[in-house]
A protein has these predicted regions:
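Thiamine diphosphate
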Residues: 1-223
Length: 223
């Protein structure tokens, strides 16, 4: 199973224009991550049993609200009426406050040949620095072994607070994860800094199609 044994090809939306934000200069206000959520919602709908979203209780904070129109948070124990957006078959792994656990679950899922991404805050993702380094090494070695199948890339989506200094600025601003990845080989690591909704959606669509990479995307979630 850990060599793409349950591999299912990822189906992606065909028409990106459907998600494009029509901008009027000086008039349009919108949130990039919220708009990306509409695209990811459709990815979930097209891949109901081979796609997961991992993150430490941040899906709504990161403005992925539209995703919950197509799925729920994964929850295997008792559900009470006060619980929000929980379900047995949810595709969002969002109910555990551990970047380590979320990244580890995603890595294992990718190894089976399936697909997904992890999202977090730019400052908090530093917790998984060493895990991502080890995965980069694994990708390098796997490329040198003929019988190793290509697998979906490890896609990391981070939100930056650099545009809102007054809100958690001291603790939430740390571009160190980019610094951590930059020295690594370019045939394994890719870093993207989309500057608006349309470039973010196009970037996410692109990285979702890649194999055997670690793709880092840093985006704004504020209006």
């Amino acid at each position: 199973s850990t060599n793409g044994g349950i591999k299912k090809e990822l189906i992606l939306p065909e028409n990106l224009d459907k998600y494009a934000l029509k901008v009027k200069r000086g008039q349009t206000q919108s949130e990039d991550m919220r708009n990306l959520g509409a695209y990811i919602k459709d990815v979930i709908s097209l891949n109901k049993d081979n796609y997961i979203i991992c993150g430490p209780d941040e899906a709504l904070s990161n403005r992925l609200n539209h995703v919950f129109e197509a799925t729920t948070r994964k929850w295997n124990t008792k559900i009470i009426k006060q619980d929000e957006l929980l379900g047995r078959n949810g595709r969002v792994i969002d109910s555990i406050l551990s970047e380590h656990a979320c990244e580890g679950m995603l890595e294992g899922y990718l190894l089976t040949g399936r697909h997904g991404f992890i999202h977090s805050y730019e400052a908090f993702v530093r917790i998984i620095d060493s895990m991502v380094s080890q995965h980069a090494k694994w990708i390098k070695m796997a490329k040198e072994i003929p019988w190793r199948k290509e697998l979906s890339s490890l896609n990391i989506l981070l939100t930056s607070h650099c545009w809102q200094q007054d809100h958690n600025g001291f603790t939430h601003q740390d571009p160190g994860f980019i610094n951590h990845l930059l020295p690594k080989k370019s045939d394994t690591i890719r870093i993207y800094l989309p500057f608006d909704t349309n470039t973010l959606i196009s970037t996410f669509d692109h990285i979702s199609r890649t194999k055997n990479y670690i793709n880092l995307v840093v985006a704004s979630k504020h209006m």
